Amino acid sequence: MTEIIDGNAVAQSIRDDLVASIDRLADAGHRPSLATVLMSEDPASETYVSMKQDDCEEVGIEAIDIDIDSDADAAELYDTIEDLNADEDVNGILVQMPVPDHVEDRSVLRAIDPMKDVDGFHPENVGRLVAGDARYKPCTPHGIQKLIESAGVDTEGKDAVVVGRSDIVGKPMANLLIQKAPGGNATTTVCHSRTENLAERTRNADILVAAAGVPEMIDGKMIQEGATVIDVGINRVDADTEKGYELVGDVEYESAKEVAGAITPVPGGVGPMTRAMLLYNTVKATGLQHDIDVDLP
């Protein structure tokens, strides 16, 4: 019988486990804090930032909310980041993407102090990840590692296929899977929009991570029997519902769950884990900045 990997439950367990470390840091005078910077009127971005703030409140992390008008000069955003970098009471900084077209997103990521880059996207932190010495693992790939672990799947020696090569998920996910570390040691293939014979490659996967952003591009016929399937996609498609749409993943769930050994649903799979690992990185950042050992789940 296929195991449905409950991302909400795993994320809740991680949040619960973080509370003791947060309390320890607070007792030492360093309650973790996370600053989220929003420069957008996009409703989805606003909702996501609000959810992150709720997560912080649940576990006892101080949430600092900064809104910048989307029409403001890029200099206002960079000045804000500079102030947050210099503020010793701020442990983590997250600029919600996407930023407006007149702001260059890579420049924004480079502007954040690498020690406070709890998304793990600063070039220094990307380099450390590739070198096998990650300071902060990017939240979504790290959350996926935790989901695979929760399903009792040992990645060592397995064939893993990552569909998607984004800087946010695909590339760092592949890097984590190949590393000589728990949750790694897999033989890993990265597929993308130019990959030929995609189905042939995905059918060889013991572990399949679908992160291409294409609705239901992977169906049951493309999956090896018993494979662990992690669906990162969250796509809005037209549907005969009250809202006029529904959310689907990159995997056609109904056919896939008939074949997979374990699978994440959409929603309720990877999404909650991304948010939980942001809290994880914020707690880790606080410990590193104040030279305090913290127990992390």
UniProtKB/Swiss-Prot annotation:
GO BP terms: L-histidine biosynthetic process; methionine biosynthetic process; purine nucleotide biosynthetic process; tetrahydrofolate interconversion
E.C. numbers: 1.5.1.5, 3.5.4.9
Keywords: Amino-acid biosynthesis, Histidine biosynthesis, Hydrolase, Methionine biosynthesis, Multifunctional enzyme, NADP, One-carbon metabolism, Oxidoreductase, Purine biosynthesis
Example of a GO MF term: methylenetetrahydrofolate dehydrogenase (NADP+) activity
InterPro entries, A to Z: Aminoacid_DH-like_N_sf (IPR046346), NAD(P)-bd_dom_sf (IPR036291), THF_DH/CycHdrlase (IPR000672), THF_DH/CycHdrlase_cat_dom (IPR020630), THF_DH/CycHdrlase_NAD-bd_dom (IPR020631)
GO cellular component: cytosol
Reactions performed catalytically: (6R)-5,10-methylene-5,6,7,8-tetrahydrofolate + NADP(+) = (6R)-5,10-methenyltetrahydrofolate + NADPH; (6R)-5,10-methenyltetrahydrofolate + H2O = (6R)-10-formyltetrahydrofolate + H(+)
Xref: Pfam families: THF_DHG_CYH, THF_DHG_CYH_C
Pathway stated in the Swiss-Prot or TrEMBL entry: One-carbon metabolism; tetrahydrofolate interconversion
Positions that bind NADP(+): G164, R165, S166, S193, I234
Complex and partners: Homodimer.
Family per record: Belongs to the tetrahydrofolate dehydrogenase/cyclohydrolase family.
Protein role: Catalyzes the oxidation of 5,10-methylenetetrahydrofolate to 5,10-methenyltetrahydrofolate and then the hydrolysis of 5,10-methenyltetrahydrofolate to 10-formyltetrahydrofolate.
Stored NCBIfam families: PRK14167.1 (NF010764)
Protein name as catalogued: Bifunctional protein FolD 1
Annotated organism of origin: Haloarcula marismortui (strain ATCC 43049 / DSM 3752 / JCM 8966 / VKM B-1809)
Gene: folD1
